[in-house]
């Protein structure tokens, strides 16, 4: 193609795409994804934002010792020639080159029912109390994170690839307001300004040889032409939240944390990407652990190059301490969560790991995370305040594959550790067929002196997304509140387990099913009197979001954690649907006021 015809082609492409965009923005399109109907439209602007604020680096109030890696200045707000060309090329890949999508990355399958995204944000909106009353102990906010793609995917899409959206119900003196906002990540901002998806999807980007090569070339072209800069982060911040050192973070393990805050009205604001005064240069886990006694926070990161695991901590003031690289982990394991005790940190090296052979990944397709059936799972135990890995001990635990940890504690004067965690019995299905996953909660005791490992099942049910009273983190705890998979990732109820009943095969002591066609999310325990050291461990409430797929109505449920049926204390009708998501937490009102 000569220069004249090339110019004509690019000009025509730009005109066509610009016309399509104008038509799309002027007349929203109703799209049906299985049983869910969603409206395709441009994402709305946060009313609490304005252009001046978005274009200036944000700072934390009354704090000057830490660095916010803010989003860069606003990019070109209109469709450019290069953007139009790249978007057209991507449409060609999706339409003509991609092989038929596997169910795990087929948007029509992945985004069915209440997994379908809400395609606009919800400003603070009053909620209706339809049962009981909201206890004063719940003054504060329950916030849950989860994937919600800003744009409906045109090609392969995995559940883990969605942009992070926070759903916060703020409660004050028996009244509640709901707000749903995207975490304004660098990725979100770039794609919002472009008007289309730009950055590659990690879990669904490898889908056949030709398509994978084409997407790789397209990604390189976008970077080289300055459409986005991966140095600014490509994370989604869609996994969880953490509150420590008087800061609230939205987390995803592929990037730095994003600092967020709730306003007095209940609105959610993204402050910016946070690097802890330049000391956190890379990603960190979405499951940091804050010691309820010392106020310190412990975390790690993992990656595809040595050291495959790096352990670190933050002091009670939020100052990051030095890294402890763990070179005794000899292959890149998928390390999503870990546990701490009073004296130790515990890591799980499982049969799920990163696929390092890029040629095989391109040729075979599938997820960049795969199963190694020839590998024996191990648990690694390191002193909590270790300066290096010299005292790290590894223990083989055949068949023990955990994604999440529930709690852990020391026994026998620190010579043994106990770990409570859901063991995934079918680890090979974790990313491709979540409906076939069965997680069996186990109690594992490791004698650090003799190396003997003892295991005992706590429940035969399919349980995950389990929590405890946060005040007992790292200490001997009795009660666990776990979500019932029916099948995963749908959650049909919650059970309460008493792990002290170790002589029984099923330690279930309470259960609450949500009803036919109703599914919920991860439960969270909120203490009735968190400042009372004499309070019983289960004296509090279990809260979660629940959605009725028959009526299309979403609710916020408050359950009595001590009652044998987890009796519903209060139910709040939400002003609109809250999609299923991942992890959340409750932040009390006094802590919200510190943000």
Curated annotation (Swiss-Prot):
Keywords: Chloroplast, Dioxygenase, Iron, Metal-binding, Oxidoreductase, Plastid, Transit peptide. Residues 1-34 form a transit peptide. Signal peptide: none annotated. Residues 55-64 have a biased composition (Basic residues). Binds 1 Fe(2+) ion per subunit. It is found in: Plastid, Chloroplast, Plastoglobule. It comes from the Eukaryota. InterPro entries: Carotenoid_Oase (IPR004294). Fe cation binds at residues 287, 336, 404, 583. Induction: Probably proteolytically degraded by PGM48 during leaves senescence. Not induced by drought stress. GO terms for molecular function: metal ion binding; oxidoreductase activity, acting on single donors with incorporation of molecular oxygen, incorporation of two atoms of oxygen. Its main location: plastid. One of its GO terms (cellular component) is plastoglobule. Its EC number is 1.14.99.-. One of its GO terms (biological process) is beta-carotene catabolic process. Transmembrane segments: none annotated. Residues 41-74 are annotated as: Disordered. Disulfide bonds: none annotated. Its cofactor is Fe(2+). Mostly expressed in flowers (e.g. sepals and petals), siliques, seeds, leaves and cotyledons. May be involved in carotenoid cleavage. PANTHER family: BETA-CAROTENE DIOXYGENASE, CAROTENOID CLEAVAGE DIOXYGENASE 4, CHLOROPLASTIC-RELATED. Belongs to the carotenoid oxygenase family. Interacts with VAR3. Interacts with PGM48. This is Probable carotenoid cleavage dioxygenase 4, chloroplastic.
């Amino acid at each position: 193609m000569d220069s004249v015809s090339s110019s004509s082609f690019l000009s025509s492409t730009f005109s066509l795409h610009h016309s399509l965009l104008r038509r799309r923005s002027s007349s929203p399109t109703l799209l049906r994804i299985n049983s869910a109907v969603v409206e395709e439209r441009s994402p709305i602007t946060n009313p609490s934002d304005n252009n001046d604020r978005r274009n200036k680096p944000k700072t934390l109030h009354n704090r000057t010792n830490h660095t916010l890696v803010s989003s860069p200045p606003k990019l070109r707000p209109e469709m450019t020639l290069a953007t139009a060309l790249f978007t057209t090329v991507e449409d060609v890949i999706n339409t003509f080159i991609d092989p038929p999508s596997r169910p795990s990355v087929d948007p029509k399958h992945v985004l069915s029912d209440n997994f379908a995204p809400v395609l606009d944000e919800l400003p603070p909106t009053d909620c209706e109390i339809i049962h009981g009353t909201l206890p004063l102990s719940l003054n504060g906010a329950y916030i849950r994170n989860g994937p919600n793609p800003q744009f409906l995917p045109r090609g392969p899409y995995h559940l883990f690839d969605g942009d992070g959206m926070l759903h916060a119900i703020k409660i004050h003196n028996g009244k509640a307001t709901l707000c749903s906002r995207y975490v304004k990540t660098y990725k979100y901002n770039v794609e919002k300004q472009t008007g289309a998806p730009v950055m590659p999807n990690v879990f669904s980007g490898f889908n056949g040889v030709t398509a994978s090569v084409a997407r790789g070339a397209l990604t390189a072209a976008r970077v080289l032409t300055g459409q986005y800069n991966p140095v600014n982060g490509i994370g989604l911040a869609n996994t969880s939240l953490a509150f420590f050192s008087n800061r609230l973070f939205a987390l995803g393990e592929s990037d730095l944390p994003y600092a967020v805050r709730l306003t007095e009205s209940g609105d959610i604001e993204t402050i910016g990407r946070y690097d802890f005064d330049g000391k956190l240069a890379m990603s960190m886990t979405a499951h940091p652990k804050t010691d309820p006694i010392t106020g310190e926070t412990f975390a790690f990161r993992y990656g595809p190059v040595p050291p495959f695991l790096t352990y670190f901590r933050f002091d009670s003031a939020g100052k990051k301490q030095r890294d402890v690289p763990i070179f005794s982990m000899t292959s890149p394991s998928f390390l999503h969560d870990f546990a701490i005790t009073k004296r130790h940190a515990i890591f799980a090296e499982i049969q799920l790991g990163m696929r390092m052979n890029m040629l095989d990944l391109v040729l075979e397709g599938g997820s960049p995370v795969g199963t190694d059936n020839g590998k024996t799972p191990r648990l690694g135990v390191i002193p909590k305040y270790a300066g290096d890995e010299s005292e790290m001990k590894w223990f083989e635990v055949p068949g023990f594959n955990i994604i999440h940890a529930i709690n852990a504690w020391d026994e026998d004067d620190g010579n043994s550790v106990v770990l409570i965690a859901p063991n995934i019995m079918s680890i090979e299905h974790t990313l491709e067929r979540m409906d076939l996953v069965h997680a069996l909660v186990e109690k594992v005791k490791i004698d650090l002196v003799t190396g003997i490992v003892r295991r005992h099942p706590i429940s035969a049910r399919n349980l995950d997304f389990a929590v405890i009273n946060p005040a007992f983190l790292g200490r001997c705890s009795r009660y666990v509140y776990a979500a019932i998979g029916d099948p995963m990732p749908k959650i049909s109820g919650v059970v309460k387990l008493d792990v002290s009943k170790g002589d029984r095969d099923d330690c279930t002591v309470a259960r609450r099913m949500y009803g036919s066609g109703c599914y919920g999310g991860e439960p969270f325990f909120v203490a009735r009197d968190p400042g009372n050291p004499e309070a019983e461990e289960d004296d509090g409430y279990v809260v979660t979001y629940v959605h009725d797929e028959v009526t299309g109505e979403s609710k916020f449920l408050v359950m009595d954690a001590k009652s044998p049926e987890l009796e519903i204390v209060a139910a709040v009708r939400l002003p609109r649907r809250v999609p299923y998501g991942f992890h959340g937490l409750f932040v009390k009102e006094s802590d919200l006021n510190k943000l």
